[in-house]
Amino acid sequence: MRGVLRGLAVVVEDVEFGRRLYKEGFYGRFLGYDKVKREEVDRINAPLVLALYEALYLVERGVLEVVTDSGEKITQTRLVELGREKLKNFDEIYKIYKYFRDLGYVVKSGLKFGALFSVYEKGPGIDHAPMVVVFLEPDKGISATDITRGGRLGHSVKKTFTLATVLKNTGEVILLGFSWARL
């Protein structure tokens, strides 16, 4: 099945295929809808919009083919190049996304929490995301104020505030989580 590259997103216009992707892993978001519960998916009649990193993940697994508006296939290599051209730190962000997905988590945008990702154990509408992930650029420090801000954010939304980065020399994903505790 295919999706069409449109700017920074890949649009799955086949509604049935979009529903299947969403049901199987909560990939993307339906155009015009916010959080959709699994039991509501069959009532949705809208295209599914995937972020570039989601589309790349599905392309790597042979689940999705990405094409241009004219139907020309975009290779996996070209999709990575486009990600690098359009998004700062695309490689690192994708590695973090892939890291959580490969562990079986559902990874959604964390924008409403001021974060890169919200990470669910089961999925939106089933459980609450126990973790918000903020990207820490490689070779960039973090201040005590940033940590305090993150801890407050995590506490206010009752989630673990997690810093994620990718080591330049090894490509390893490194996580550092903060949770509030009563002492």
From Swiss-Prot:
Question: Does the UniProt entry include the keyword Iron?
Answer: no
Lyase as a keyword of this entry, yes or no, is yes
Q: Which InterPro entries match?
A: tRNA_endonuc-like_dom_sf (IPR011856), tRNA_intron_Endo_cat-like_sf (IPR036167), tRNA_intron_Endonuc_cat-like (IPR006677), tRNA_intron_Endonuc_N (IPR006678), tRNA_intron_Endonuc_N_sf (IPR036740), tRNA_splic (IPR006676), tRNA_splic_arch_short (IPR016442)
Q: Which GO terms describe its biological process?
A: tRNA splicing, via endonucleolytic cleavage and ligation
Q: What is its EC number?
A: 4.6.1.16
- Role: Endonuclease that removes tRNA introns. Cleaves pre-tRNA at the 5'- and 3'-splice sites to release the intron. The products are an intron and two tRNA half-molecules bearing 2',3' cyclic phosphate and 5'-OH termini. Recognizes a pseudosymmetric substrate in which 2 bulged loops of 3 bases are separated by a stem of 4 bp.
Annotated membrane-spanning segments are none
**Subunit comment:** Homotetramer; although the tetramer contains four active sites, only two participate in the cleavage. Therefore, it should be considered as a dimer of dimers.
Listed GO MF terms = lyase activity; nucleic acid binding; tRNA-intron endonuclease activity
What is its EC class?
lyase
Which residues are catalytic?
Answer: 120, 128, 159
Name the UniProt record assigns to this protein: tRNA-splicing endonuclease
Catalysed conversion reaction: pretRNA = a 3'-half-tRNA molecule with a 5'-OH end + a 5'-half-tRNA molecule with a 2',3'-cyclic phosphate end + an intron with a 2',3'-cyclic phosphate and a 5'-hydroxyl terminus
Q: What is the lineage of its organism?
A: Archaea, Thermoproteota, Thermoprotei, Thermoproteales, Thermoproteaceae
Tell me the protein family, please.
Belongs to the tRNA-intron endonuclease family. Archaeal short subfamily.
Q: Name the PANTHER family on file.
A: TRNA-SPLICING ENDONUCLEASE SUBUNIT SEN2
Q: Which Gene Ontology cellular-component terms appear in the entry?
A: cytoplasm
Q: Which UniProt keywords apply?
A: Lyase, tRNA processing
